[in-house]
Swiss-Prot record:
Assembly and oligomerization: Component of the 7-subunit TFIIH core complex composed of XPB, XPD, TFB1/GTF2H1, GTF2H2/P44, TFB4/GTF2H3, TFB2/GTF2H4 and TFB5/GTF2H5, which is active in NER. The core complex associates with the 3-subunit CDK-activating kinase (CAK) module composed of CYCH1/cyclin H1, CDKD and MAT1/At4g30820 to form the 10-subunit holoenzyme (holo-TFIIH) active in transcription.
Location within or outside the cell: Nucleus
Protein name: General transcription and DNA repair factor IIH subunit TFB1-3
Organism superkingdom: Eukaryota
Gene Ontology biological-process annotations: DNA-templated transcription; nucleotide-excision repair
Gene behind this protein: TFB1-3
Keyword annotations from UniProtKB, A to Z: DNA damage, DNA repair, Nucleus, Repeat, Transcription, Transcription regulation
PANTHER family reported in the protein's UniProt record: TRANSCRIPTION INITIATION FACTOR IIH-RELATED
SS bond list: none
Residue span, BSD domain: 107-161, 186-238
Family statement: Belongs to the TFB1 family.
Gene Ontology annotations for the cellular component aspect, listed alphabetically: transcription factor TFIIH core complex
A Pfam family hit: BSD
Length: 579
């Protein structure tokens, strides 16, 4: 369980914002500020008592935990339901500790986890929602023990994974402006499918949108209304009708936030320009501008992307979007937050940007040193030797002038002057020698049997042809994208669950102990339950999607069938051996 709280060491303490993570054996508080050293870890069996404010007492929802050492830990929650949920969770954990007191004193070697390893396991479960689902499904249901579950993930718990986890996660190369909605031809409505990855990318590329979300949601509008206005502004951008955009911006001040230039990005650009070499002549690049020529320029949605000076406040260019998108992709994921709460993601990203901004600011001494170093490297024209250029510097406005001037030079060169001479006889000899070797020794046996490869090829051909008929000609669209979100998540979860079960099943053979026999029996029952869930899922989907879902489910059922067949044959062999 995880809740957003404010930790207080005493009553009048202003508090530290962070997240409270609860398990049956430990309570962990992690502050939002990554530079803060305030981290709290409390063993559940060390909690002596808990006090809380009553609902309706005009006091904030506080939960005061007192340890057996006499220390008080006060947590202020956002609302009373969160506080009551945590209080009930701690009460159940304390009751379990009282029922099994021996387990608190005498621990098996597998249960004697160090604090660092426990924190790492907790961190992995918190950051990986799919891993958390598997842990809840198999460990809490007693199909696997805690030790068995983590035994197949030693790389995640090793030192190498700790070092690799510091690497920043990348972002997809797809631009935010390239998100296309689905259109309903009957109601003339467009629907955008927003995922947590897309929301994070929007917040990273557009700081003004991120700040507007923090300011407006939920004080002035709901999250749905916010994204509706955002995509309305994006639609106005795509139409290139600046007059309509200006009119709607004048009537709706919230919509105007998305249409105005991003002041946060402009401020960041001004700060970056202070670090640019002042001797750099950026006007020299103007001669490379070919966008005004025929057959040149950048096309966007079928028309040239040109900004008119009088309307540049209400229109972005494709170059601006590309440059910003490239900068965000190169920067990577600067925060490590996996949460369904959009506000948590926005606030965490804002804090990370503020920290990086503070780290990147140039101090006065560093700026002075940079200027002095550049002044020493700057050349003075009157002290340099005269440079007599044989030709005048080129400033080509039209590339055709260059290519037409080079055509005469090419025709004047003797034919074949630069052509490399190939030894035809040598190549023929090598080819003839290779053919003789094949005739003498013959070809080796194929790695894959022809009938197997033909069956796979035929299956792929049927699948691809069926998918093309259903999905159309859009290569970026997959069948999973057409499924309802609940069905898509269910298919993915079943696939990861089956992988987990099958991995533990096959690693338990050969069965040499009673422990392995019991473990295989539990896994077999869990796989049977999953098999029935797959059949139920196939029957529950729409009729037009049932065939494609069956194709997705078929490899899962084949993997389970192979495990069942091996289980039955091995059980018969062991039974016959005993009798």
């Amino acid at each position: 369980m995880e809740k957003r709280v404010k930790y207080k060491s005493f009553v009048k303490d202003p508090g530290t914002l962070g997240s409270l993570e609860l398990s049956e054996v430990m309570l962990l508080f992690v502050p939002n500020d990554p530079k803060s050293d305030l981290k709290l870890k409390v063993q559940t069996h060390n909690i002596k008592s808990q006090k809380y404010t009553k609902e309706g007492s005009n006091k904030p929802p506080w939960l005061n935990l007192t340890s057996k050492q006499g220390r008080s830990h006060i947590f202020e929650f956002e609302n009373y339901p969160d506080m009551h949920a945590c209080r009930d969770f701690i009460t159940k954990a304390l009751a379990k500790c009282e029922e099994e007191p021996n387990k608190l004193v005498v621990l098996t070697p597998a249960e004697q986890l160090s604090m660092a390893e426990f924190e790492l396991r907790f961190k992995l479960l918190r950051e990986n929602s799919e891993l958390q689902k598997l842990h809840k499904q198999f460990v809490e249901s007693k199909v696997l023990t805690e030790d068995e579950f983590w035994s197949t993930r030693k790389k995640l718990l090793g030192k190498d994974s700790i070092r690799k986890s510091k690497q920043q996660m990348g972002l997809k190369s797809m631009m935010v402006s390239g998100i296309k909605p689905s259109t309903d031809g009957r109601t003339n409505r467009v629907t955008f499918n927003l995922t947590s990855e897309i929301i994070f990318q929007i917040f990273a590329e557009k700081p003004a949108v991120r700040q507007a979300f923090i300011n407006y949601v939920p004080k002035k509008m709901t999250e749905k209304d916010f994204w509706t206005k955002y995509f309305r502004a994006e639609y106005l951008y795509s139409t290139k009708n600046t007059a309509v955009a200006a009119a709607e911006a004048a009537e709706d001040e919230e919509l105007a936030v998305f249409l105005k230039p991003d002041e946060i990005l402009a401020q960041e650009a001004r700060q970056k320009m202070r670090r640019v070499d002042p001797t750099l002549d950026m006007d020299a690049d103007e001669g490379d501008d070919y966008t005004h020529l025929m057959d040149h320029g950048i096309q966007r949605d079928g028309t040239n992307d040109i900004i008119e000076p009088q309307n540049d406040q209400l229109k972005r260019s494709l170059l601006q979007d590309l440059n910003r998108h490239a900068a965000v992709v190169l920067e990577g994921r600067c925060i490590n937050v996996q949460s369904e709460d959009t506000r948590i993601v926005a606030e965490a990203l804002t804090r990370a940007k503020q920290v990086s901004k503070a780290d990147g600011e140039i101090t006065k001494d560093a700026n002075q040193e940079r200027l002095e170093r550049m002044s020493r490297a700057t050349e003075m024209e009157d002290l340099q030797a005269p440079q007599n250029f044989p030709l005048a510097p080129l400033s080509i406005k039209d590339p055709r002038d260059y290519f037409e001037s080079q055509q005469g030079n090419i025709l004047s060169e003797p034919r074949g002057a630069k052509a490399s001479k190939r030894n035809v006889h040598e190549a023929y000899g090598l080819l003839k020698e290779s053919i003789l070797v094949i005739r003498m020794t013959g070809l080796s046996d194929p790695l894959i049997k022809p009938e197997v490869s033909f069956e796979v090829f035929s299956s792929l051909t049927r699948t691809i042809s069926t998918a093309k008929n259903i999905l159309g000609k859009n290569p970026q669209e997959s069948f999973l994208d057409r499924l309802p979100k609940s069905t898509k998540d269910e298919v993915i979860h079943h696939w990861t669950s089956i992988q987990e079960l099958v991995r533990h099943f096959w690693s338990s053979y050969p069965i040499t102990t009673t422990y392995l026999s019991t473990k295989v029996g539990k896994l077999k029952d869990a796989m049977s339950n999953t098999y029935s869930l797959l059949d139920a899922m196939k029957q529950s989907v729409q009729s037009d999607l049932r065939h494609q879902v069956s194709l997705l489910v078929r490899p899962m059922q084949q993997a389970l069938d192979a495990a069942f067949q091996h289980y039955e044959s091995d059980l018969q062999r062991r039974t016959a051996k005993i009798t």
